[in-house]
Amino acid sequence: MNIKQYLDSTYLKTAEQAGITEEENILVAQEFIQEAIEEHFKLIMIRPNRVSLAKKMINGANSILEIGTVIDFPEGKSAIEEKLKEAVQAIQDGADDLDFVCNYQAFKKGDTDLVKEEILRGTQLGLANNKVVKWIIEVAALSEKEIIQLSSLIKNVIVSNFEQELFSKVFVKSSTGFYTTENNLPNGATVPAIKMMLENASPLPVKAAGGVRTYEEAVAMIQLGVKRIGTSGAKKIANGQNSTNEY
C-alpha cells in the first residue's frame, strides 16, 4: 500500500487561528506545499487564497501534486450563489479538488431542498470543469441518524443526476476539523461515523478528515474503505510516526 496516495496534506489555519502574523502564515503554507511536493503526497489542501501560490510552486517544481481547497469554510451556511462564486474563483486559480462545506445547519433544521440544490449545483460546476468535488458533512455536529440521512441524501442527489462513471469524483467527507465540540469530544473522523458514511454514501467514495494522527489509524481507515485522508500530519503518518497536530 502506498499510503501517500491516500493523504491530502492539509493546512487550513488562518494567521489568527495559528497565532502568527499573515506573513508568517504564508511561510507556513509554503512549507506545507513544499513538503507535499517532496513527499509525493496525493494532494495539498489549502485555503482558497493560497491556491495560486501552490500552483506556482508546483509548476516550478515540475510536480504532479494536486491542489485542493475548501469552499464556504468552515461553517457552510453561505447562500448557494456565494458558494458557487468562491468555487469558480478557486477553479480559475488552479484548484483540482473542491471541498464544499455542506449547509449541515440547514439540513438539521429540515431544509433538505436547499441542501439538495447546493449539492446538485456545486457538483455540476465541479464536474463540468473536470474537478473532484467533496461534500463535508461535519459529523461532530450531527447525530448518528443525521450522519446516515445526510450521507444518503448526497448519494441520492449524485446517483439521480450524474452518470455512473462520475461517481468516483464526488466524495462525502467527514469533517472540517474546525468544529468546536463540548466535553472534548472528537471533532473529526471517528470509526463509527466513517462506517455509517461508508454504508450510506456508497457508491460514492468517502474521505476521513480530522483526528487521524497515526499510521495505524490511517491504515485502519483505509481498510474500512476510505479513499482519502485529510491530515496536517501527513509526513509523520507516512513515516510511521504519530502526529501531534490538531487536524
Regions found by a protein language model. Name each.
Residues 75-89, 109-120:
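Glycine-rich anion/phosphate-binding loops
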Residues 2-14, 43-46, 65-72, 98-100, ...:
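Hydrophobic faces of well-ordered beta-strands that scaffold small-molecule active sites
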Residues 78-92, 142-153, 195-203, 212-228:
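Catalytic cores of alpha/beta
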Residues 48, 52-73, 112-134, 141, ...:
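Alpha-helix-loop-beta-strand connector modules within alpha/beta enzyme cores
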Residues 1-80, 92, 153:
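Conserved N-terminal beta1-alpha1 strand-loop-helix module at the mouth
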